[in-house]
Amino acid sequence: MNDSVNFRSFKKGDYEVCCEWWKWWWKSSGQDPVIRAFLPKDERCFIIEKNGVPVACYFLFIMEPSIVGWTTYLVSNPQYNERDRREIIKLLVTNVEKEAEKIGIMQLFTVCGNQQMSNIHESLDWMLIPVKNEAFKYLTNNFKK
């Protein structure tokens, strides 16, 4: 069977899926899912799927002026336990970087939230700064425009 990985922006029902994931991941803290109004519009909310199964979501905020972006609230499917989980999450981050480059973003910031996310971002050439779990990356292709 050929595996199909699909990266896309949100469609109806995706926010509710993320809420279920946040509830699972944040159950020990008692934190509520992110309120929809705090997230960007659907075209800046991204999801990656494998064989039709949602694996993870990531959100891109664009600052004004629109050369700086902020990615946040990366959440993954707690039921997806395949060996390629980390690689699919890395692909999600990479694809969101590409979306940011398309619209002229030159630098991305994120708060990684935990060591696994820090490791993933660092492996993708994000520069980790000496504040716990924060990282940024210059999207240098946009410096040449």
Which residues does each PLM region occupy?
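Short amphipathic alpha-helix that is part of the acyltransferase structural core
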Residues: 1-33, 132, 145
